[in-house]
Amino acid sequence: VLTNSAVIAEDGRKFSKTGFMIKFDEAAEKIGADTVRYLYAGAPVSNDVRFGYNLGDEARRKLLSYWNIFTFFETYAKIDKPNFENYTPDKSAMTPTDIWLVVRTNEFLKKAKALYDDYKVYMLVKEFEVFVDDISNWYIRTNRRRFWKTGDEKDKMTAYWVLYYALNTATLVMSPVIPFMTEHIWQNFTRKVMPSSPISVHLCDWPKPIEGLEDDGIVEKTAVSREIIATAMRLRNEQQLKVRQPLSTLYVCCDSETANKIGVFEKIILDELNIKNIKYIDDVNVLEDKYLTVNFKVAGAVLKQNVNKMKQTLETLSKDDMTKLVSAVEQGDEVYVPGWDDKFAADIFSVQTKTKKGIVSAELQNDKGVVALDTVLTDELIKEGLVRDTVRQCQLIRKEAGYEVEQRVKMAIESLDTAVIGALKEKTEYIKSELLADELVLGGTLSDADLTKEVEIGDGKVKLAVAKA
């Protein structure tokens, strides 16, 4: 039998029967019995168990991520009512993210079995948290639209089944650790889509992995793609560019092997980052501009008192003129500088480089390459950003009004900012599609609105109103 030596307070103090203590019944009532069990399970047996309500809240937040996967599935399953009783997924129809999640679930299942056999439940808890994060912040995030789009029912069913396999496996694996939460999910998730399942999660055999799936290195490809997304997101944050603001180009400087790995996820990368194009480059110099400066050591004898005048001339040259001069200097030709009568030897100039305007970059881990963003915003990109900001605010007011996800609505958007209204008029069909809106009033309001709200979009106030269609 393995057990922890003692339970101590979260700040390291010892509990006492006559002094500071937390009664189990009180803790179970306040943070839940499963949370208490989860805290204990997550502590290595070689250490004392630290226990307290702050740690309990942290553990509960981690369990909430698992719960939210169930909530997401349940929300859309209420509409579509998927049933897997006699369902066999078409593996050839699976997307790369589908294959990744099945392979990732098999991997989690294998690790969980080994850790249970080794009595290393605390390591299982950590693996579970990583697995839940993978499902939430990669699979669901990149496949959300598949669960509510209409038309391709086969693809939607595949997405349901893959998510079911992952969530069901996690529920079975974690049932000894968090028995009450897993039982609730079993009854309200597994037995709804697979009615012939055992009547309790605690009466099940150990789950079996899905065999016969060609992964083709999908786990590594996914890891590289996620790193590119995370790095580019960090660059966005540093430049204070919201994800809803589209950008023109993502540059990835890498070798051909890395480029091939992420090729299958190009669309997902661009969608996640809200960027129009991805360009692969083999040298970061592509992201730099060359320009000339005066080589003072040599130029002094030639230009004498006109050295600073030449410096000022170079600083005011157009981009085209500078490009021509740089090319001439690099070839060692004599150089004619606009505004000057004489030609000059190439050695009185120095070729320098600087990052192109609007380009920001960062290196990937382990020398895998460099990621760069073009942050220059054109009028079209700015208008599209206004539209996406407006759609986001409208989605929030829909939710605040308490509508079901499938509810058709009427929406009104009123603003004194003509730039906002002008941008919205160009994208009315897109806006209606995103909001499930049968009617969209721009520049007016609704007489029967269920909820009206004023929000900030762009540089001004926008008044939103929503009603059921």
Features from the language model and the residues they span:
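Non-catalytic, structured segments within soluble enzyme domains
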Residues: Y38-G42
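Short, solvent-exposed helix-loop connector elements
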Residues: N47-L55
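C-terminal catalytic domains of large/alpha subunits in multi-subunit enzymes
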Residues: A33-D34, S46
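Feature 926 captures the class I aminoacyl-tRNA synthetase adenylation module centered on the KMSKS loop
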Residues: T3-K30, N54-A469
